[in-house]
């Protein structure tokens, strides 16, 4: 019998959630995603020392530019061993500023193009705030496709679909974490709140004819991945990808299009109200932005203090 990883690839596009070039080359995903936390880990790997040096040398003392140059250098390397696309993230500190997000997205695309990488192989990752979604809407019209991340609520998913974004990344594991702590209980299988959230979004998109890709993210265990077999894409850490590759047994498609809710079009006030009413989404979005911003600052400091 083929491994569970190979079976999953029959239903779902598998994406590697890492900046580890060697792991990507070994596990052979279609696409790859990075974020400030993963880039901070990548910066500690010996193979990226030269990228760090060049990023710093070419940035004129601008630590933010150095981070973008490093992210693009890592992304270009990864694109050499995958057939698909790399997701590169805008500075999380810009999550509530549409204009600044647009400017940073344009810079990332320009840096990739300077390296001979066309925009068709890049997704710009942006936090799923109201301001981030509005910036993504403009980028999509410009032919720059986006990956809306830190997505925890149905309101965020509905707004992203209405804006015509290319792809969303709902965070399964972080939703699970919040409910496990809040309710003081464990969840397995289809009752997992993170699994239920992604399943609801997937069926809503399919029922209403949205083309936005649903890419489940942030997994804590194989059970969550198995429940979402059939999702458009799943971005998975190297450790869990390896566990799937080492696992035998049948992996059926469990997520199928089905009855979805009627289409919702949310204006800003409705979006903000629905977010306000969802304590989990409000807390996890804020926490996620803070964590990514913290790791961005750590990476900037590391680049600024290189000798």
Curated annotation (Swiss-Prot):
UniProt pathway: Carbohydrate degradation; pentose phosphate pathway; D-glyceraldehyde 3-phosphate and beta-D-fructose 6-phosphate from D-ribose 5-phosphate and D-xylulose 5-phosphate (non-oxidative stage): step 2/3
**Alphabetized UniProt keyword annotations:** Cytoplasm, Pentose shunt, Schiff base, Transferase
Compartments where located: Cytoplasm
GO MF, any single term: transaldolase activity
What Gene Ontology cellular-component terms does the record carry? Answer: cytosol
Report the top EC class in one word.
Answer: transferase
Keyword Ribonucleoprotein among record annotations: no
Q: Identify which residues the record assigns to the active site.
A: 125 (schiff-base intermediate with substrate)
Q: How does it assemble?
A: Homodimer.
What's the stated role of this polypeptide?
A: Transaldolase is important for the balance of metabolites in the pentose-phosphate pathway.
NCBIfam families per UniProt: talAB
Annotated protein name in UniProt: Transaldolase
Starting at the broadest rank, the lineage of the source organism is: Bacteria, Pseudomonadati, Pseudomonadota, Gammaproteobacteria, Pseudomonadales
């Amino acid at each position: 019998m083929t491994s569970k990883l190979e079976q999953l690839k029959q239903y779902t596009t598998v994406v590697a959630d890492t900046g580890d070039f060697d792991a990507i080359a070994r596990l052979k995903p279609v696409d790859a995603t990075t974020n400030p936390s993963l880039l901070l880990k990548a910066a500690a790997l010996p193979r990226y020392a030269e990228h760090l040096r060049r990023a710093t040398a070419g940035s004129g003392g601008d630590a933010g530019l150095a981070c973008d140059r490093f992210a693009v250098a890592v992304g270009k390397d990864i694109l050499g061993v995958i057939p698909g696309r790399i997701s590169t993230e805008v500075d999380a500190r810009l999550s509530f500023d549409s204009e600044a997000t647009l400017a940073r997205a344009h810079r990332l695309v320009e840096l990739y193009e300077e390296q001979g990488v066309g925009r068709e192989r890049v997704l710009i990752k942006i936090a799923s705030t109201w301001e981030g979604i509005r910036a993504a809407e403009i980028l999509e019209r410009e032919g720059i496709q986006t990956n809306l991340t830190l997505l925890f609520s149905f309101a965020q998913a509905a707004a992203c679909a209405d804006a015509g974004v290319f792809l969303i990344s709902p965070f399964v594991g972080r939703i699970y974490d919040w409910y496990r702590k809040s309710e003081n209980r464990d969840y397995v299988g289809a009752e997992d709140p993170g699994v239920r959230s992604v399943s609801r979004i997937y069926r809503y998109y399919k029922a209403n004819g949205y083309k936005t890709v649903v890419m489940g993210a942030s997994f804590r265990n194989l059970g969550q991945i198995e429940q979402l077999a059939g999702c458009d894409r799943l971005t998975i850490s190297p450790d869990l990808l390896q566990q799937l590759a080492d696992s035998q047994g049948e992996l059926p498609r469990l997520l199928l299009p089905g009855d979805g809710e009627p289409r919702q079009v949310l204006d800003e006030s409705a979006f903000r109200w629905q977010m306000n009413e969802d304590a989990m989404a409000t807390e996890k979005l804020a926490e996620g932005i803070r964590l990514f911003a913290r790791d961005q600052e750590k990476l900037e400091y590391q680049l600024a203090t290189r000798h």
